[in-house]
């Protein structure tokens, strides 16, 4: 018997990431090749943005996707998020020239407060929310705090792009396929302070750390390359990474819904106090997922260098949180 369609809401749907994302969701990449979907697409109430969204929907229609059970355009989160099973919060205020980080935080806090309240009011009680729009961790925290009637665990931030970037750098370094590498993680904030950590990683069951055996490469090449990859792409292409971000969003939600078969992935999730990270801080952790529920991988040894890096990214997150506290009432 055919499955009932799942409702997937996407914000910033006419943007660059949206354009790379929507066709893949409609093709079954997000929720599985037997799961029909209804797309509920949100864009700002600006005539140009709404017109662009109509154009995107025309193209989606023209693909005649077998799994697509419907697609609707919205300018109001209260209708876009109605009964949503999955919400991908992609739209965010980008940092403009001369804009301080503080201004960026405040501008986004307003957007994510409104969206959190709308999710709280109308989304499915089991909605899985992924925040892609930056600063992703703090935006997810704001949305979560604005939705007191939804479980905090429903709100996540995307660190999968950082995870995938780290994975490909390691695969290239040790000349192994990415599929052979397991137990990699990225701790902390989706920002250059993140800490990609391969101390526990294996390739075909053998230690990656021993295979690389180069602390100088780790500190001087690997960490900065992964941490500043977004800036390097802007420098090369003139625009920010969209297709790779969309791909990471698909990976994150697919694994959250369909499970990871015991494999580690990285998700930005509300802390339960593990590894000394204050409760409710949205932080990148190694997790496994089963039956739609993620669990933090426990019992990992944190050496002095790792603790220093984790403290650094946590400090930044707590500063961001402090910067938006007055907006959360």
UniProtKB/Swiss-Prot annotation:
Binding-site residues, NAD(+): 12-18, 108, 115, 132-134
Pfam families reported in the protein's UniProt record: Ldh_1_C, Ldh_1_N
Keywords of the record: NAD, Oxidoreductase, Tricarboxylic acid cycle
Catalytic class of the enzyme: oxidoreductase
Molecular function terms, GO-annotated: L-malate dehydrogenase (NAD+) activity
Record has Cell inner membrane as a keyword: no
Gene Ontology BP, a term: tricarboxylic acid cycle
Matching InterPro entries: L-lactate/malate_DH, Lactate/malate_DH_C, Lactate/malate_DH_N, Lactate_DH/Glyco_Ohase_4_C, Malate_DH_type2, NAD(P)-bd_dom_sf
Cited Gene3D superfamilies: Lactate dehydrogenase/glycoside hydrolase, family 4, C-terminal, NAD(P)-binding Rossmann-like Domain
Similarity field: Belongs to the LDH/MDH superfamily. MDH type 2 family.
EC number: 1.1.1.37
NCBIfam families in alphabetical order: MalateDH-SF1, PRK05442.1
Protein name, entry field: Malate dehydrogenase
Catalytic activity: (S)-malate + NAD(+) = oxaloacetate + NADH + H(+)
Active site: 190
Originating gene: mdh
Binding positions (substrate): 95, 101, 134, 165
CDD domains named among the record's database cross-references: MDH_chloroplast-like
